[in-house]
């Protein structure tokens, strides 16, 4: 069939050949033109979609729905939290300052000075001698017998430590007044009735610290 078509083409007059060639060329140009047109339309459509996506992405937060609002920055949240905490911190500082008003720096200093003298000065030697004589003269108890049988250096240290404990219990470095001491003495009175040695030590501690309370 191809050979028959070729034979017919050879026998065809030259002017018909030209017409057919022109028609074929025109069809090719039209086909190419349609392809370019389709490609141009596709490009325009892509550009339009891209433009719409860009506009949608640049929408300001104020135009977003409430459920799509942008999250608050961490710094903003931290600032808000610090503002909420600030009154509490101020309250704590004021509370500490009010507690400081209940303390007497003068009494604290005098108490620490007295305790230091008991451990390092002649006052401590005089104290342990007095306590030893009073414990020796009192009615014998298991506690008194235990103290009297201690080695002298150990006994002196124990008596000084017990005296310090009573000083800090009765004075406490606060604005201690006589009525405060009386109240604290009443608190420990049942215990002192059972522990006569402790009562003797407490009495000597009070004798040493009375001037601090009366200041």
Curated annotation (Swiss-Prot):
Subcellular location: Host cytoplasm
InterPro entries reported in the protein's UniProt record: Paramyxo_C
Signal peptide span: none
Compositionally biased spans, kind Polar residues: 51-65
Domain notes for this protein: The disordered region at the N-terminus is involved in C protein self-degradation in trans. This self-degradation of C protein may play a role in the regulation of viral RNA synthesis. The disordered region at the N-terminus is also involved in the host STAT1 degradation in order to counteract the host innate antiviral response.
Membership in a protein family: Belongs to the respirovirus protein C family.
Assembly mode: The different isoforms interact (via C-terminus) with unphosphorylated and phosphorylated human STAT1 (via N-terminus), favoring the formation of parallel STAT1 homodimers. The different isoforms do not interact with host STAT2. C protein interacts with L protein; this interaction has an inhibitory effect on viral transcription and replication.
Name of this chain's protein: Protein C'
Species of the source: Sendai virus (strain Harris)
GO BP terms, alphabetized: symbiont-mediated suppression of host innate immune response; symbiont-mediated suppression of host JAK-STAT cascade via inhibition of STAT1 activity; symbiont-mediated suppression of host JAK-STAT cascade via inhibition of STAT2 activity; symbiont-mediated suppression of host type I interferon-mediated signaling pathway
UniProt modification remark: Y1 and Y2 proteins are produced not only by alternative initiation, but also by proteolytic cleavage of C'. Only alternative initiation is detected in vitro, whereas in vivo cleavage seems to be predominant.
Ranges for region Involved in self-degradation and in host STAT1 degradation: 15-22
One Pfam assignment: Paramyxo_C
Additional comment: The C protein is found in virion at a ratio of approximately 40 molecules per virion, presumably associated with the nucleocapsid. The P/V/C gene has two overlapping open reading frames. One encodes the P/V/W proteins and the other the C/Y proteins.
Task of the protein: The different products prevent the establishment of cellular antiviral state by blocking the interferon-alpha/beta (IFN-alpha/beta) and IFN-gamma signaling pathways. They inhibit IFN-alpha/beta induced tyrosine phosphorylation of STAT1 and STAT2. Blocking the IFN-alpha/beta pathway requires binding to STAT1 in the cytoplasm. They inhibit IFN-gamma induced serine phosphorylation of STAT1. Block the IFN-gamma pathway by binding to and stabilizing the parallel form of the STAT1 dimer, further inducing high-molecular-weight complex formation and inhibition of transcription by IFN-gamma.
Positions of the UniProt region annotated as Disordered: 12-34, 51-71
Organism superkingdom: Viruses
Cystines in this chain: none
One cellular-component annotation, GO: host cell cytoplasm
Keywords: Host cytoplasm, Host-virus interaction, Inhibition of host innate immune response by virus, Inhibition of host interferon signaling pathway by virus, Inhibition of host STAT1 by virus, Inhibition of host STAT2 by virus, Interferon antiviral system evasion, Viral immunoevasion
């Amino acid at each position: 069939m191809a050979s028959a078509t070729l034979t017919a083409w050879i026998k065809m007059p030259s002017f018909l050949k030209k017409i057919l060639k022109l028609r074929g060329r025109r069809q090719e140009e039209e086909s190419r033109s349609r392809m370019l047109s389709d490609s141009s339309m596709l490009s325009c459509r892509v550009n339009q979609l891209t433009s719409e996506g860009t506009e949608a992405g640049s929408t300001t937060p104020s135009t977003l729905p409430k459920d799509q609002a942008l999250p608050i920055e961490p710094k903003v949240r931290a600032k808000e939290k610090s503002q909420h905490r600030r009154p509490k911190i101020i309250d704590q500082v004021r509370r500490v300052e009010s507690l400081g008003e209940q303390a007497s720096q003068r009494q604290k200093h005098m108490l620490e000075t007295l305790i230091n003298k008991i451990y390092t000065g002649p006052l401590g030697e005089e104290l342990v001698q007095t306590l030893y004589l009073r414990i020796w003269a009192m009615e014998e108890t298991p506690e008194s017998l235990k103290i009297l049988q201690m080695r002298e250096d150990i006994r002196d240290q124990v008596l000084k430590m017990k005296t310090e404990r009573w000083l800090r219990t009765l004075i406490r470095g606060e604005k201690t007044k006589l009525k405060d001491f009386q109240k604290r003495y009443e608190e420990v009175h049942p215990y002192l009735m059972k522990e006569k040695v402790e009562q003797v030590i407490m009495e000597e501690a009070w004798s040493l610290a009375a001037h601090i309370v009366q200041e």
